[in-house]
């Protein structure tokens, strides 16, 4: 049996895996146990009451967190004309059409989000094998294919998170950094859960949000008592 590190022993002593914690207590635990030499991200896993094998029960979308994610987001935009100028004015690092596609084909991938206006999808469509596996392919459901590219750029820069359930019906995303205040992390989590509830598929039956766990990059998951969250449906 592998020997537990000192860090893991401390986590096991502090975190009760059978308990759901008040959100404030859960955040305090994460902060206490975040001892890495860098500012860890705070990640969330939300178990949904869906059958992920059925396409009409899959959950996918995006929402802007009120306090952002703490990350500097680099944005690439496929568009032209007045939209190109608007995207640049909104803060996009890369804007273009065929010229931008050629850069990506050549391996230049120094961006975190790709946005496209509908008229640019003929160009973006040819990059599916490059962007798709990296989770960067623009999609109307996440607001990254839109005629209003400037607004999409602003949302991405403001801390928009995109979510999509995995094959087990779990949503994984980030809600900030461990140096955020407890209130900021709580409000970001509440915004995400509210967005997920609004995205509930009509055919999903029973309890929709089954379990919420938060963790830091190097830490263990801490289950959150949903009753301590203020969310809207």
Curated annotation (Swiss-Prot):
Keyword terms, alphabetized: Repressor, Ribonucleoprotein, Ribosomal protein, RNA-binding, rRNA-binding, Translation regulation, tRNA-binding
One GO term of the biological process aspect: translation
GO MF term set: rRNA binding; structural constituent of ribosome; tRNA binding
Gene3D superfamilies: 3.30.190.20, 3.40.50.790
The organism's place on the tree of life at top rank: Bacteria
InterPro entries: Ribosom_uL1_bac-type, Ribosomal_uL1, Ribosomal_uL1-like, Ribosomal_uL1/biogenesis, Ribosomal_uL1_3-a/b-sand, Ribosomal_uL1_CS
Record carries keyword Metal-binding: no
One GO location term (cellular component): cytosolic large ribosomal subunit
Classification via SUPFAM superfamilies: Ribosomal protein L1
Subunit structure, as described in the record: Part of the 50S ribosomal subunit.
Similarity remark: Belongs to the universal ribosomal protein uL1 family.
Function: Binds directly to 23S rRNA. The L1 stalk is quite mobile in the ribosome, and is involved in E site tRNA release.
Protein's name according to its UniProt entry: Large ribosomal subunit protein uL1
Organism for this UniProt entry: Shewanella baltica (strain OS185)
High-level lineage: Bacteria, Pseudomonadati, Pseudomonadota, Gammaproteobacteria, Alteromonadales
